[in-house]
Amino acid sequence: LLVRPDITFRLFQFLNCQEIDISFLKNMPHMKRLRIDCIDFKSNTNRINLSVLAELSLKSLHMECFDLIDYEFIQNLSDELEELFIMADTMGAGIRFDCTWLLKYKNLHTLWLGKKAKKNLEKINQLPKLKSLSLRGIKLTDFSFLWKMNLEKLALLWNSNSNLNELANLKSLKEIELWRINKLSDISFISELTNLEIIKLQDLKHVTSLPDLSRHPNLQRVFLIDTGINVKELPNYLQEKVSNWDNR
């Protein structure tokens, strides 16, 4: 890890362990990227001593743990944090998480939030370096808080939005991903995002056509995965950019 700080150290499953002691991570000073996933907290809400994370010099943290309720440890991570992934999936009513906790991380450039990590979501527009935002299961009725940001990537996943026209104001976007937005049929706003390089549409059965993309000089790839769009009906300049799987 000293030689390859880009490598992610992963902790997962521990199916037969009622309690998991991760204090050994303090003996790995060169670890910068950590992923903790496939661990269920339903039977024991204190299954892992997550307070240990405050003693690590993490630049990237990926948390995908079912029924994890208390995320207060997020407030005490390293000031070096650049990437944060929080699945926030539970069977219960809610979690302890607040987006205002993230404002101390001035170097945060990539943020992925799951459906219950949405309290004070609009405050993330105060993160000066945030470039990539992914929201899963979070339905927004007002996107205007995003207009103040210079986002380069936006991903909206698993929500019930039917009108995304406000996204036309995000002129700095280079990549947009829309995935399993069941009520969505109109994506005409994409024609206004002329800096786009990547468009990814997945599991959008009601989306049957692409808008005019002839004013998108930087467009490189268009991923169309399980949509209602007939690729053969697209203009030739688009057909050559289309792929039905994301191989990046």
Protein language model regions, located:
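Concave beta-strand-loop units of leucine-rich repeat
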Residues: 1-20, 24, 30-103, 107-141, ...
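Serine-hydrolase catalytic core
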Residues: 190
